[in-house]
Amino acid sequence: MQLKRVAEAKLPTPLGDFLMVGFEELATGHDHAALVFGDISGKTPVLARVHSECLTGDALFSLRCDCGFQLEAALTHIAEEGRGILIYHRQEGRNIGLLNKIRAYALQDQGYDTVEANHQLGFAADERDFTLCADMFKLLGVDEVRLLTNNPKKVEILTEAGINIVERVPLIVGRNPNNEHYLDTKAAKMGHLLSK
């Protein structure tokens, strides 16, 4: 186990009350969170989303990506279902950090795509560690999920880490003229499944 469960509190939202659970990485002290809606116990697979932190999309409403749209849609789906989990994976910018993400945006403004921009900065296309998320599911007592994602790599890594993904639920929202090239690049170079 790479994390420990350290705190929890009620989080009232326009969609209803979630339980916010805080986790801490044992090696680094970095924190992550999960929003739990309803009763996630029992044998029925839980609707879940692993959402990687995106300050620009989630909080600042950027149109450069689909992250904020996905966050809102995932929470709505979970609330409508009556039970589920959203893991808020605190690895900003596919885990290159906010400052490098801003640098990558500047490179994209010069014509690089999102993958090329990461490479120009010395990073892989995706630096995230989804095994942490598998540990969060386990600490919540969940090992079977219906995963809201377009990323087959996320499914593969979580499965290898012991989470049974019984269904991949597409989450295709937020396409606009500002992020078309970004989404096309994610499909072409990173294998994301973005066609309905």
Curated annotation (Swiss-Prot):
Enzymatic reactions: GTP + 4 H2O = 2,5-diamino-6-hydroxy-4-(5-phosphoribosylamino)-pyrimidine + formate + 2 phosphate + 3 H(+)
Binding site for GTP: R49, V50, H51, S52, E53, Q70, E92, G93, R94, T114, T149, K154
Matching Pfam families: GTP_cyclohydro2
Keywords associated with the record: GTP-binding, Hydrolase, Metal-binding, Nucleotide-binding, Riboflavin biosynthesis, Zinc
E.C. numbers: 3.5.4.25
Functional summary from the UniProt entry: Catalyzes the conversion of GTP to 2,5-diamino-6-ribosylamino-4(3H)-pyrimidinone 5'-phosphate (DARP), formate and pyrophosphate.
NCBIfam families, A to Z: PRK00393.1 (NF001591), ribA (TIGR00505)
Description of how the protein assembles with itself and partners: Homodimer.
Protein family per UniProt: Belongs to the GTP cyclohydrolase II family.
The protein's name in its UniProt record: GTP cyclohydrolase-2
UniProt organism field: Salmonella typhimurium (strain LT2 / SGSC1412 / ATCC 700720)
